[in-house]
């Protein structure tokens, strides 16, 4: 999938908490932790779980998660 966002970092899901509507995802990139809040539906569609390899996509207005 091509993206216009240039800030893409590979990492591993360090923690994920899925709520009724939203999911809080913590991704470890090197020695850093990056947090993102995404919809529950997105987390379920991507089958996100702790330890998954993902790509963090950072835009000026949001931080997205893409599963590798």
What spans do the regions from the language model cover?
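Non-catalytic connector elements of ABC transporters
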Residues: 1-68
């Amino acid at each position: 999938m091509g993206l216009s966002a240039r800030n893409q970092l590979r990492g591993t899901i360090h923690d994920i908490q899925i709520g009724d509507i939203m999911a809080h995802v913590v991704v470890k990139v090197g020695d850093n932790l990056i947090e993102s809040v995404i919809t529950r539906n997105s987390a379920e569609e991507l089958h996100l779980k702790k330890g998954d390899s993902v790509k963090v996509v950072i835009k000026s207005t949001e931080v997205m998660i893409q599963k590798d």
